């Protein structure tokens, strides 16, 4: 087999941080001069998470080639340089759909279609396709869910078969939770033992066990886990809860020397990893930096994972400017919304769907425009800006988006050509990376280091109605970014405002700790200028 494969499974509890672990391993292996690819296998029956409630699932992360994926792919991107595409994510829904489609087309020649071998063969093909697409030295495969869940069984059986055929080229890391009982002042390894026992019962013997814990495990506990789980003592690794930031994770894994174990086990030709630049950034994040307050106005603010990439992009940009982003979640339905915004240095309205909270976001944009507070509207946040401007500057009182009011006499935001939200919702939006031409002299042009052509990722169905663009521009709302050749409105700026910008795309999806997105840097710069203004109380 031309590549090596690391399978990452989880046990005891969910939300262990497998995605962060996979991303951290990718970073370390890349620093050992290996080419790494990533694959997330999710056991849910949705074809993709695109139609799932953010409260239930968290944010939807979009790849360059227009695939709606799990938020873990955002972690993969922010930590590593692994190329992510439609071959980096698969769900049970996708896999079952492919098998059923082939059965309907007669591809199985009358055979009884079963989980084994048809579903498991399809899962194996997904793994092979991911490797073929990216040609990695190492493919890291994260299996969603928890060992013992019924829905994960086909994936685990596929992994068992894959390992059987390629035993020398595969490694399984099983991640577990080792709880600490405060009353007894001790950690308990029994849940880990039971989880490994369940995994072994499926036919998978882990090569290493990665123990997540609140406190460091003693050598005695590690030895106990080694003995009862039948793995070498040196293959029991421990990561404790991070103290300050998730970006500590690669440093913790490097300290455990897990990459050395992987290299020996898979016979990889590597060099020692150099994480010095990463360590510098993590140390900065751990300092008591001056804060910049950013109000994020949305309807899912109680669930931070719903805006994960937004929050991380703000953190990246603030750190680049020597500050810590203090993110103030503001519910778009909060009656005291403007009072809360008055205490912030800037406001960001992220993407979203639906009428709930819409008028609150309009109120936030109006308040920021009138008070000179820096405003960054992303996707829906840009549409909020345009509708507010039309209502209160163009005096089109009933201006609205067709999404919010299908009967509005002034559809400032309308459905894109070829889009019909009533026909189908899953995977039908304008998705993925598209080019954008920037207008010289604009704030956006300056932020992008005066590049004339950029490319950003999209996820939307509605756009600014071109019938109103001339009137908007005549009243001071500049269209400074357009998508060729149709000229779709991509970036807008308010001329007489210090920094009020809306973008139809999602810049947060490409921000990294080591390379913050330029628009977020410009936004934080504007917030810092505003915070120093003597008139800001």
From Swiss-Prot:
Enzyme class: ligase
Primary role: Catalyzes the ATP-dependent amination of UTP to CTP with either L-glutamine or ammonia as the source of nitrogen. Regulates intracellular CTP levels through interactions with the four ribonucleotide triphosphates.
Designated name of the protein: CTP synthase
Binding-site list for L-glutamine: 352, 380-383, 403, 461
Annotated catalysed reactions: UTP + L-glutamine + ATP + H2O = CTP + L-glutamate + ADP + phosphate + 2 H(+); L-glutamine + H2O = L-glutamate + NH4(+); UTP + NH4(+) + ATP = CTP + ADP + phosphate + 2 H(+)
Chain sites annotated for binding UTP: 14, 188-193, 224
Pathway listed: Pyrimidine metabolism; CTP biosynthesis via de novo pathway; CTP from UDP: step 2/2
GO cellular component: cytosol
Alphabetized PANTHER family for the sequence: CTP SYNTHASE, CTP SYNTHASE-RELATED
Effect of residue 279 to K: In strain: CWL029 and TW-183
Pfam families in the record: CTP_synth_N, GATase
Note, other: CTPSs have evolved a hybrid strategy for distinguishing between UTP and CTP. The overlapping regions of the product feedback inhibitory and substrate sites recognize a common feature in both compounds, the triphosphate moiety. To differentiate isosteric substrate and product pyrimidine rings, an additional pocket far from the expected kinase/ligase catalytic site, specifically recognizes the cytosine and ribose portions of the product inhibitor.
Organism placement in taxonomy: Bacteria, Pseudomonadati, Chlamydiota, Chlamydiia, Chlamydiales
Region spans: Amidoligase domain: 1-268
Similarity remark: Belongs to the CTP synthase family.
Entry binding sites for Mg(2+): 72, 142
NCBIfam families reported in the protein's UniProt record: PRK05380.1 (NF003792), PyrG (TIGR00337)
Keyword check for ATP-binding: yes
Assembly, per entry: Homotetramer.
Stated regulation of activity: Allosterically activated by GTP, when glutamine is the substrate; GTP has no effect on the reaction when ammonia is the substrate. The allosteric effector GTP functions by stabilizing the protein conformation that binds the tetrahedral intermediate(s) formed during glutamine hydrolysis. Inhibited by the product CTP, via allosteric rather than competitive inhibition.
Residues that coordinate or bind ATP: 15-20, 72
